[in-house]
């Protein structure tokens, strides 16, 4: 297991408190949301993977926000399409 130092990640995010929030959010995405890691897993836990992604500049709070908005938009579009199909079928 690779040892992770958080200093590089703190420098990418700004402060250690925001780092905790961003890393936890990303780790949760991988664990619960089924998102794939952006770095090799190397048998690491999702929290370590999240920190490595942040260290490499692949994940920031802004990137997570944009991805969440895109996914929400796609989900809303799919729901609208389904409702439209149901409504057209009733005519």
From Swiss-Prot:
Reaction catalysed by this enzyme: RNA(n) + a ribonucleoside 5'-triphosphate = RNA(n+1) + diphosphate
Molecular function terms, GO-annotated: DNA binding; DNA-directed RNA polymerase activity
Protein name from the UniProt record: DNA-directed RNA polymerase subunit omega
One Pfam family recorded for the sequence: RNA_pol_Rpb6
The protein's role, per its UniProt record: Promotes RNA polymerase assembly. Latches the N- and C-terminal regions of the beta' subunit thereby facilitating its interaction with the beta and alpha subunits.
Listed EC numbers: 2.7.7.6
HAMAP family noted in UniProt: RNApol_bact_RpoZ
A Gene Ontology biological process term: DNA-templated transcription
Gene3D superfamilies: 3.90.940.10
GO CC terms, sorted: DNA-directed RNA polymerase complex
Coiled-coil region list: none
Subunit structure: The RNAP catalytic core consists of 2 alpha, 1 beta, 1 beta' and 1 omega subunit. When a sigma factor is associated with the core the holoenzyme is formed, which can initiate transcription.
Keyword annotations: DNA-directed RNA polymerase, Nucleotidyltransferase, Transcription, Transferase
Keyword Metal-binding among record annotations: no
